[in-house]
Design a protein with these regions (language model features):
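Conserved alpha/beta enzyme-core scaffold
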Residues: 1-636
């Protein structure tokens, strides 16, 4: 499709709705970049047009921040995203603080950390539960939406699927049905590689005002797979033991969730090693016996998650995602009782996964495209209004379907009395957004056998210093303490539901890093929230990295815990470079370390240096880069 064709669509749209375009765009994958860029470019050229973009998670391939990063990233990005990936022009302009005066961008969820310090983005951030986004879009007067869709031909005519993004679109259409005075023009563009997804995502040709049936020439944005380190594995293992057989699973994105999925697969297929990991008692291990387990899954799990991602694919392939649900209360009750065989022809037809949006690796997208006609209906996409809450008229059915639910998310910090910080900093700078986290925490409390689990690393590194992520207090709160439930770190499990403040403090101190336990304990004592005589139990006084390494050693040996258990988008050499460059970045905060590295250097790692274009350094700067890189590569 030519630029002229896109320009014609812009002309026709402006003639219909005028020069004030309030443009709603889907979160993440479903944005038709070239079409969006055509509207953005027109507004840049014509200042009489006002373009207000309302969206979330605007994805662009990363831009290198230094020369060394560029040497590593540029070849990888060209290979991974293609040479001509159509970047979102508005997102680049926003990041560069160069938006024209007649264009605004309002988002309810940022790519993590991408907008810290960006005043324009921070000022226009909207804090909204995922389930409230459609309402808020309508309140802002959205009069135009653009979205990628999938298409298939049937005997009765073409069918369309909202595919990766029925999440807000379906709720928005329902919102407009209740507001007949508001008009919104809905345009869709067919993407030939977008998987055709089943469920409520399937719509007919009249759902949109116009369908553009031409290739957008836009590779699906595939997330590069991230490494999992020792702490990620341990957090994931601890959380995996809280998942009950015949239960329901919701997970988010990130290396902690990847560690959780890996833990569930080990529980299923390497159960002896899995049990060995828990041979030394963890803080909070009694909760495993009460609500989870160490046995392999028999009935399996059902996925009900706002985000459908690679992890669910791996769980399906591992024979864990196999518990069926049915959209009929009587059938679902039979299924929960293990009596679905009493209904001939029903077993094997239920859904295994209900999601609201998907985003993942290129392998994940290919797997979705290749689902056979028996499998495809078992992986359904629906509105976030249905996935992220119980109410809406089918509460009893959804409660039956979501039995023994474990809603597992990540956070950045936890206060000692149980409040969690997941999306922002103390000066109200937003790191990401609340998304659906509050929805799932609230839903866990609304269900008799549901639990909310928040995972976090006990510490973080910043500017060469280690800081505790379990704190006495923090000014920014995402989940208030009255909704406290379960917190998991690499050192153990803290069960906070229904506990007193003192009991919460005691539980969280036991899963904190030992470097910070005493100072935190003293703060709680000084505040009158902890008895002065209470001491950290002996078994929780050795919460150090060495303890974690020993625990993994007992569960199959160190080689059983690779950096990329589900595969990598990087070559073997690039995987070593990722570690080395990370080590160099951390060293940048210490001039002494950098000087020592430059002097010591390391052996000549020809393959890695060639990949970075530093095998034959010419300039003084290149020779310095080569020495620093050889130093960082020594242990990788």
């Amino acid at each position: 499709m030519s630029n002229h064709d896109y320009a014609d669509i812009v002309d026709q749209t402006i003639r219909r709705i005028g020069k004030h375009l309030i443009l709603g765009l889907p979160l993440g994958l479903g944005k038709p970049n070239r079409l969006i860029n055509a509207f953005y470019q027109r507004a840049c050229e014509d200042s009489s047009i006002r373009l207000d973009i309302v969206t979330a998670l605007s994805l662009n391939p990363p831009k290198p921040g230094s020369e060394l990063e560029a040497r590593f990233l540029e070849p990888f990005l060209a290979r991974h995203f293609g040479e001509d990936y159509p970047r979102l022009a508005y997102a680049d302009a926003l990041a560069a603080r160069q938006l024209p005066d007649n264009i605004t961008v309002t988002e309810f969820y940022f790519q993590s950390g991408s907008m810290l310090g960006n005043s324009e983005a921070q000022r226009r951030y909207v804090s909204s539960n995922y389930t409230h986004v459609a309402r808020d879009l309508a309140d802002r007067g959205v009069n135009l939406t653009l979205q990628l869709v999938a298409r298939r031909n049937t005997d009765s005519g073409p069918q369309y699927s909202l595919s990766c993004n029925p999440d807000v679109t379906l709720d928005l259409v329902e919102e407009f049905r209740q507001r007949p005075e508001q008009d919104c023009l809905m345009l869709a563009q067919v993407h030939p590689d977008l998987p055709f997804m089943a469920g409520d995502a399937v719509v007919d040709e009249h759902f949109f005002d116009r369908v553009i049936d031409s290739d957008p020439q836009q590779p699906l944005f595939a997330l590069p797979r991230s490494p999992i380190d020792t702490r990620d594995y341990c957090v994931g293992m601890n959380a995996s033991a809280l998942v009950a057989d015949a239960g329901t699973l919701q997970i988010g994105i990130g290396s902690l969730s990847d560690g959780l999925v890996d833990g569930l697969i080990r529980r299923q297929h390497h159960n002896e090693d899995y049990r060995a990991y828990f041979s030394d008692t963890l803080p909070g291990q009694a909760l495993i016996d009460a609500i989870g387990g160490l046995d392999a899954f028999d009935t399996g799990l059902y996925g009900a998650s706002e985000m459908f991602l690679d992890g669910f694919m791996h769980l399906y392939q591992a024979g864990i995602l196999k518990r069926e649900v049915f959209d009929d209360e009587a059938l679902q009750s039979l299924a929960n009782e293990g009596r679905i065989d009493e209904q001939p022809g029903v077993k094997g037809t239920g859904a295994l996964m209900d999601g609201a949006f998907f985003l993942g690796s290129s392998d994940f997208y290919q797997w979705l495209r290749e689902l056979n006609e028996d499998e495809r209906p078992r992986f359904r996409m629906s509105s976030v209004g249905r996935i992220n809450q119980l109410y809406g008229g089918t509460e009893r059915l959804e409660t039956l379907q979501r039995q023994k639910a474990r809603f597992i998310n990540t956070c950045m910090m936890v206060g000692l009395t149980g409040a969690a910080t997941s999306d922002g900093l103390k000066d109200h700078q937003l790191v990401s957004g609340v998304g659906g986290q509050y929805n799932f925490v609230a839903m866990a409390h609304a269900m008799r056998d549901g639990r909310s689990i928040l995972m976090l690393r006990s510490t973080r590194e910043s500017k060469g210093k280690t800081h505790s992520n379990i704190v006495w207090e923090y000014p920014h709160v995402t989940i208030p303490r009255h909704l406290r439930d379960i917190v998991v770190t690499e050192y153990g499990i803290a069960d906070l539901r229904g506990r007193s403040d003192e009991e919460c403090i005691q539980a969280l101190l036991q899963i904190s890093d030992s470097e910070f336990q005493e100072s935190l304990r003293q703060q709680a004592v000084n505040a009158g929230k902890l008895h002065p005589d209470w001491e950290i139990p002996t078994e929780a006084q050795h919460n150090h990295a060495a303890t974690l390494a020993r625990r993994l050693e007992t569960a199959g040996g160190r080689d059983a815990w690779p950096d990329y258990p589900a595969g990598s988008d990087f070559t073997d050499t690039e995987q070593r470079l990722v570690k080395a460059l990370g080590q160099l970045k951390a060293a940048m905060h210490s001039k002494a370390t950098l000087l020592s590295a430059a002097i010591q250097s390391g052996p000549d790692d020809r393959e890695a240096l060639e990949r970075m274009g530093l095998a034959q350094p010419g300039t003084l700067k290149e020779r310095l880069y080569a020495r620093l890189l050889r130093w960082a590569l020594r242990s990788h």
